[in-house]
Regions:
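A glycine-rich, hydrophobic/aromatic-adjacent loop/helix-cap motif
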Residues: 2-242
Length: 242
Protein backbone atom coordinates (compact mmCIF):
# COMPACT_ATOMS: atom_id res chain seq x y z
CA UNK A 1 0.00 0.00 0.00
CA UNK A 2 1.61 3.27 -1.06
CA UNK A 3 0.76 6.94 -1.17
CA UNK A 4 0.56 6.64 -4.95
CA UNK A 5 -2.00 3.84 -4.89
CA UNK A 6 -5.25 4.73 -6.70
CA UNK A 7 -8.10 5.70 -4.41
CA UNK A 8 -10.51 2.83 -3.82
CA UNK A 9 -14.11 3.25 -4.96
CA UNK A 10 -16.18 5.15 -2.41
CA UNK A 11 -18.55 2.67 -0.81
CA UNK A 12 -20.03 4.21 2.36
CA UNK A 13 -20.72 1.82 5.26
CA UNK A 14 -24.33 0.65 5.55
CA UNK A 15 -26.43 3.17 7.41
CA UNK A 16 -23.94 6.02 7.23
CA UNK A 17 -25.65 9.40 7.26
CA UNK A 18 -22.73 11.45 5.97
CA UNK A 19 -22.70 10.67 2.26
CA UNK A 20 -20.34 11.69 -0.52
CA UNK A 21 -23.07 13.98 -1.91
CA UNK A 22 -23.32 15.81 1.40
CA UNK A 23 -19.54 16.04 1.65
CA UNK A 24 -19.42 17.57 -1.83
CA UNK A 25 -21.55 20.46 -0.55
CA UNK A 26 -18.78 21.37 1.92
CA UNK A 27 -15.94 21.59 -0.63
CA UNK A 28 -14.96 25.08 -1.73
CA UNK A 29 -12.01 26.55 -3.61
CA UNK A 30 -9.57 27.92 -1.04
CA UNK A 31 -6.10 29.42 -1.50
CA UNK A 32 -3.03 27.77 0.00
CA UNK A 33 -2.05 30.20 2.77
CA UNK A 34 1.13 28.36 3.71
CA UNK A 35 1.87 26.97 7.18
CA UNK A 36 0.11 27.94 10.36
CA UNK A 37 1.39 31.27 11.74
CA UNK A 38 4.58 30.78 13.75
CA UNK A 39 5.40 27.37 12.30
CA UNK A 40 8.83 26.87 10.71
CA UNK A 41 9.83 24.02 8.41
CA UNK A 42 12.35 21.46 9.57
CA UNK A 43 15.49 21.59 7.46
CA UNK A 44 16.51 18.59 5.37
CA UNK A 45 19.29 17.90 7.88
CA UNK A 46 16.86 18.10 10.81
CA UNK A 47 14.47 15.69 9.11
CA UNK A 48 17.31 13.26 8.44
CA UNK A 49 18.47 13.45 12.07
CA UNK A 50 14.96 12.89 13.38
CA UNK A 51 14.42 9.90 11.07
CA UNK A 52 17.72 8.42 12.23
CA UNK A 53 16.69 8.91 15.85
CA UNK A 54 13.51 6.89 15.38
CA UNK A 55 15.30 4.29 13.26
CA UNK A 56 17.80 3.78 16.09
CA UNK A 57 15.03 3.60 18.70
CA UNK A 58 13.45 0.69 16.82
CA UNK A 59 16.57 -1.36 17.74
CA UNK A 60 16.42 -3.37 14.53
CA UNK A 61 12.95 -4.71 15.34
CA UNK A 62 10.09 -4.37 12.83
CA UNK A 63 8.92 -0.77 12.82
CA UNK A 64 5.17 -0.29 13.07
CA UNK A 65 3.12 2.88 12.59
CA UNK A 66 -0.15 3.19 14.52
CA UNK A 67 -2.78 4.82 12.31
CA UNK A 68 -6.07 6.04 13.75
CA UNK A 69 -7.14 8.70 11.21
CA UNK A 70 -5.93 9.84 7.81
CA UNK A 71 -2.85 7.59 7.82
CA UNK A 72 -5.28 4.67 7.43
CA UNK A 73 -6.65 5.98 4.15
CA UNK A 74 -3.79 8.15 2.94
CA UNK A 75 -0.47 6.75 4.15
CA UNK A 76 2.84 8.21 3.05
CA UNK A 77 5.01 5.15 3.44
CA UNK A 78 5.30 1.66 1.96
CA UNK A 79 3.81 -0.99 4.24
CA UNK A 80 4.51 -4.70 3.96
CA UNK A 81 1.93 -5.80 6.56
CA UNK A 82 -0.90 -4.46 8.64
CA UNK A 83 -2.99 -5.52 11.64
CA UNK A 84 -5.85 -4.19 13.67
CA UNK A 85 -4.65 -2.90 17.00
CA UNK A 86 -5.77 -1.13 20.16
CA UNK A 87 -3.94 1.63 22.01
CA UNK A 88 -5.21 1.67 25.59
CA UNK A 89 -5.19 4.93 27.51
CA UNK A 90 -5.85 7.02 24.38
CA UNK A 91 -8.91 8.07 22.40
CA UNK A 92 -9.60 9.95 19.16
CA UNK A 93 -10.52 13.58 19.62
CA UNK A 94 -11.25 16.40 17.20
CA UNK A 95 -9.22 18.84 19.27
CA UNK A 96 -6.61 20.41 16.96
CA UNK A 97 -7.66 23.86 15.80
CA UNK A 98 -6.52 24.52 12.23
CA UNK A 99 -6.64 27.71 10.15
CA UNK A 100 -4.92 26.00 7.21
CA UNK A 101 -5.27 22.73 5.26
CA UNK A 102 -8.91 21.88 6.16
CA UNK A 103 -9.74 25.18 7.80
CA UNK A 104 -9.32 28.88 7.22
CA UNK A 105 -8.78 32.01 9.34
CA UNK A 106 -12.47 32.87 8.81
CA UNK A 107 -13.70 29.37 9.67
CA UNK A 108 -11.11 27.37 11.63
CA UNK A 109 -11.40 23.63 11.41
CA UNK A 110 -10.65 20.75 13.76
CA UNK A 111 -8.43 17.77 13.11
CA UNK A 112 -8.04 14.58 15.11
CA UNK A 113 -5.39 13.79 17.67
CA UNK A 114 -5.07 11.25 20.46
CA UNK A 115 -5.99 12.48 23.92
CA UNK A 116 -5.55 10.66 27.19
CA UNK A 117 -8.14 8.19 28.43
CA UNK A 118 -10.19 5.34 27.05
CA UNK A 119 -9.08 3.21 24.12
CA UNK A 120 -8.45 3.72 20.43
CA UNK A 121 -8.92 0.95 17.88
CA UNK A 122 -6.89 1.50 14.73
CA UNK A 123 -4.50 -0.15 12.32
CA UNK A 124 -0.76 -0.73 12.60
CA UNK A 125 1.36 -0.79 9.45
CA UNK A 126 4.80 -2.39 9.24
CA UNK A 127 7.33 -0.33 7.30
CA UNK A 128 9.43 -1.83 4.55
CA UNK A 129 12.84 -2.88 5.91
CA UNK A 130 15.31 -2.23 3.10
CA UNK A 131 14.94 1.58 3.18
CA UNK A 132 13.67 2.08 6.72
CA UNK A 133 15.34 5.48 7.18
CA UNK A 134 13.71 6.84 3.99
CA UNK A 135 10.32 5.41 4.96
CA UNK A 136 10.46 7.03 8.40
CA UNK A 137 11.57 10.29 6.86
CA UNK A 138 8.58 10.27 4.51
CA UNK A 139 6.05 9.85 7.27
CA UNK A 140 7.78 12.42 9.49
CA UNK A 141 7.69 14.92 6.64
CA UNK A 142 3.99 14.34 6.22
CA UNK A 143 3.03 14.42 9.90
CA UNK A 144 5.41 16.76 11.72
CA UNK A 145 7.45 18.66 9.15
CA UNK A 146 7.54 21.76 11.34
CA UNK A 147 9.87 22.32 14.28
CA UNK A 148 6.97 23.17 16.56
CA UNK A 149 5.47 19.70 16.05
CA UNK A 150 8.48 17.48 16.73
CA UNK A 151 7.15 16.46 20.15
CA UNK A 152 3.96 15.18 18.52
CA UNK A 153 5.54 11.84 17.58
CA UNK A 154 5.75 9.16 20.24
CA UNK A 155 5.96 5.42 20.77
CA UNK A 156 2.84 3.75 22.15
CA UNK A 157 2.13 0.11 23.05
CA UNK A 158 -0.51 -1.37 20.75
CA UNK A 159 -2.32 -4.62 21.50
CA UNK A 160 -3.06 -6.92 18.55
CA UNK A 161 -4.35 -10.47 18.13
CA UNK A 162 -0.72 -11.51 17.56
CA UNK A 163 0.57 -9.80 20.71
CA UNK A 164 1.66 -6.38 21.91
CA UNK A 165 3.96 -4.24 19.75
CA UNK A 166 5.60 -0.84 20.12
CA UNK A 167 4.37 1.49 17.39
CA UNK A 168 5.15 5.05 16.37
CA UNK A 169 2.17 7.37 16.27
CA UNK A 170 1.57 11.07 15.77
CA UNK A 171 -0.32 13.86 17.51
CA UNK A 172 -0.67 11.96 20.77
CA UNK A 173 -1.10 14.16 23.82
CA UNK A 174 -0.98 17.56 22.11
CA UNK A 175 -0.88 20.63 24.34
CA UNK A 176 -1.00 24.39 23.92
CA UNK A 177 -3.31 27.16 22.85
CA UNK A 178 -4.31 25.37 19.63
CA UNK A 179 -5.91 22.49 21.55
CA UNK A 180 -9.64 22.51 22.21
CA UNK A 181 -10.28 19.56 24.52
CA UNK A 182 -13.59 18.06 25.56
CA UNK A 183 -15.79 19.99 23.15
CA UNK A 184 -19.38 18.67 23.03
CA UNK A 185 -20.05 16.60 19.92
CA UNK A 186 -22.71 19.01 18.66
CA UNK A 187 -20.18 21.86 18.83
CA UNK A 188 -17.59 19.77 16.98
CA UNK A 189 -20.21 18.89 14.34
CA UNK A 190 -21.04 22.57 13.83
CA UNK A 191 -17.38 23.25 13.04
CA UNK A 192 -16.77 20.17 10.86
CA UNK A 193 -19.82 20.89 8.71
CA UNK A 194 -18.51 24.36 7.81
CA UNK A 195 -14.70 24.33 7.77
CA UNK A 196 -12.81 23.95 4.51
CA UNK A 197 -9.25 24.70 3.38
CA UNK A 198 -7.14 24.24 0.29
CA UNK A 199 -6.79 20.46 0.74
CA UNK A 200 -10.50 19.84 1.41
CA UNK A 201 -13.13 20.05 4.13
CA UNK A 202 -13.32 18.71 7.65
CA UNK A 203 -16.49 16.82 6.72
CA UNK A 204 -14.53 15.05 3.98
CA UNK A 205 -11.86 14.09 6.51
CA UNK A 206 -14.48 12.64 8.86
CA UNK A 207 -16.24 10.79 6.04
CA UNK A 208 -13.03 9.16 4.80
CA UNK A 209 -12.01 8.16 8.32
CA UNK A 210 -15.34 6.59 9.22
CA UNK A 211 -15.71 4.59 6.02
CA UNK A 212 -12.13 3.27 6.11
CA UNK A 213 -12.40 2.31 9.77
CA UNK A 214 -15.52 0.35 8.86
CA UNK A 215 -13.52 -1.56 6.24
CA UNK A 216 -11.38 -2.86 9.11
CA UNK A 217 -14.45 -3.66 11.21
CA UNK A 218 -13.89 -0.68 13.50
CA UNK A 219 -16.83 1.49 14.50
CA UNK A 220 -15.78 4.29 16.81
CA UNK A 221 -18.91 5.23 18.78
CA UNK A 222 -18.13 8.95 18.97
CA UNK A 223 -17.15 9.23 15.29
CA UNK A 224 -20.29 7.37 14.24
CA UNK A 225 -22.48 9.77 16.22
CA UNK A 226 -20.43 12.68 14.91
CA UNK A 227 -20.99 11.76 11.27
CA UNK A 228 -24.74 11.70 11.94
CA UNK A 229 -24.59 15.17 13.50
CA UNK A 230 -22.42 16.57 10.69
CA UNK A 231 -24.85 15.23 8.09
CA UNK A 232 -27.71 16.97 9.91
CA UNK A 233 -25.72 20.22 10.05
CA UNK A 234 -24.93 20.15 6.32
CA UNK A 235 -28.58 19.52 5.44
CA UNK A 236 -29.65 22.38 7.71
CA UNK A 237 -27.11 24.79 6.19
CA UNK A 238 -28.29 24.09 2.66
CA UNK A 239 -31.99 24.19 3.57
CA UNK A 240 -31.40 27.66 5.02
CA UNK A 241 -29.54 28.73 1.87
CA UNK A 242 -32.24 27.43 -0.47
Amino acid sequence: MTADSPERPVVPPPGISLTQDLVALTIREKPDLGPEPGWTHLTEAELDALAEEYRAESHGEPLWIFAYGSLIWKPDFDAVAHRRGTAYGWHRSFCLKMTRWRGSPEQPGLMMALERGGRCDGVIYRLREEDRHAQIRRVLHREIRFRENVSMARWVPVHTAEGKVKALTFWAGPRGERIASKLPLDEVAHILARACGHVGSCAEYLFNTVRHLEEFGIRDRNLWRLQELVAEEIRAIHCEAA
